[in-house]
Amino acid sequence: MKETRRKRILLTGGGTGGHLFPAIAAAQQFCREYPGAEVLFVGTKRKMDAETLERYGFKGVAINSYGLKGKNMRELVKALLVLPISCLQALFILARFRPDLVLGVGGYVTGPVVAMAKLCRRPTLIHEQNSVPGLANRKLAKLVDRVCVSLPASASCFPADKVVFTGNPVRENLVALAAKAREVKEGVTLLVLGGSQGARSLNRLIVEAFVGVGSESLAGINLIHQTGTKDLAWVKQAYGDAGRDVWVEPFFKDMDAVYSQADILVSRAGATTLAELATLGKPVILVPYPFAADNHQQKNAEYYVQGGGALLFKESELTAPQLVEAVISIATNREQRERMEFNQRRLAPTDAAGKIVAVCRQLINRDEL
């Protein structure tokens, strides 16, 4: 009979908030269902990942790892040379932590960690957030025990007998925020999110829309603008020169406060942001990042547009006057806004974190037989 001990789950992935936040949501649910569970994140050396994990009370370690896709020859050689080191580091972490299960959430760091976990005969599963799977998850699907998917379109990319449709998990603080009654406030507030890396072209469009020719029609709309670090200074100056009072930050750490203020959003189409907006019932104007791998942001966006919760524009075709018109059409038409809010909530993932942990439980129980 095996000795009873606290369950241990190792999660791996990261490099963007889109990978990290679903992992945090799954970890939170795992700790609820397994009181006293030990959780370890294995990720990249990105400072923002470490700060985010610390804010949510989780421990993380980093390994040396580089992406393979879309690299020039020099970068590709570097990534391949580092890969054996990544695998050795992963083996060392696995030997020390001895997890009951390993969950990969995508990103290049996932590859060596999940592959080594399989070599160590640990139960493994991956979670895919996007409509078009990333390279790491496509390759790992052949090795792992289960594949959890967020959007229906990605299911066909994986072995059918391994796929479980779970949806994309949302952090518990945002689920709690969605359950709160909305405050009655003056005016309409637009929130602009360019993704965790910011978005220069999107920033330019927003600034032109709010301070350029024709911006008078947006005078009654409050604006909150996440710029990313590189564009912060000039965006702030542009609003200041125009006498526009705008809440501008490179990144928002307290997304609860920001989301609670927002009535409408302009955003990229990362899968995790979309799941959060659907949970909160926020109408959104989507401008997918045109250089996303396999055009996955466009595919993500189409799911929410078809469901009636979003409007969609290609960055290459969108002009500031068109953006102004789209914002005004939602801001001034309460019926349309409420319809989009309803549709967003209808598209929201239902207990995605619980479904992922249910799969974890099945694999752990099977391994203990």
From Swiss-Prot:
One of its GO terms (molecular function) is undecaprenyldiphospho-muramoylpentapeptide beta-N-acetylglucosaminyltransferase activity. Belongs to the glycosyltransferase 28 family. MurG subfamily. CDD domains: GT28_MurG. Pfam families: Glyco_tran_28_C, Glyco_transf_28. Keywords: Cell cycle, Cell division, Cell inner membrane, Cell membrane, Cell shape, Cell wall biogenesis/degradation, Glycosyltransferase, Membrane, Peptidoglycan synthesis, Transferase. This is UDP-N-acetylglucosamine--N-acetylmuramyl-(pentapeptide) pyrophosphoryl-undecaprenol N-acetylglucosamine transferase. UDP-N-acetyl-alpha-D-glucosamine binds at residues 16-18, 130, 171, 196, 297. It comes from Desulfotalea psychrophila (strain LSv54 / DSM 12343). GO terms for biological process: carbohydrate metabolic process; cell division; cell wall organization; lipid glycosylation; peptidoglycan biosynthetic process; regulation of cell shape. PANTHER family: GLYCOSYLTRANSFERASE, UDP-N-ACETYLGLUCOSAMINE--N-ACETYLMURAMYL-(PENTAPEPTIDE) PYROPHOSPHORYL-UNDECAPRENOL N-ACETYLGLUCOSAMINE TRANSFERASE 1. GO terms for cellular component: plasma membrane. It is a peripheral membrane protein. Pathway: Cell wall biogenesis; peptidoglycan biosynthesis. Its EC number is 2.4.1.227. InterPro entries: GlcNAc_MurG, Glyco_trans_28_C, GlycoTrans_28_N. Cell wall formation. Catalyzes the transfer of a GlcNAc subunit on undecaprenyl-pyrophosphoryl-MurNAc-pentapeptide (lipid intermediate I) to form undecaprenyl-pyrophosphoryl-MurNAc-(pentapeptide)GlcNAc (lipid intermediate II). It is found in: Cell inner membrane. It catalyses: di-trans,octa-cis-undecaprenyl diphospho-N-acetyl-alpha-D-muramoyl-L-alanyl-D-glutamyl-meso-2,6-diaminopimeloyl-D-alanyl-D-alanine + UDP-N-acetyl-alpha-D-glucosamine = di-trans,octa-cis-undecaprenyl diphospho-[N-acetyl-alpha-D-glucosaminyl-(1->4)]-N-acetyl-alpha-D-muramoyl-L-alanyl-D-glutamyl-meso-2,6-diaminopimeloyl-D-alanyl-D-alanine + UDP + H(+).
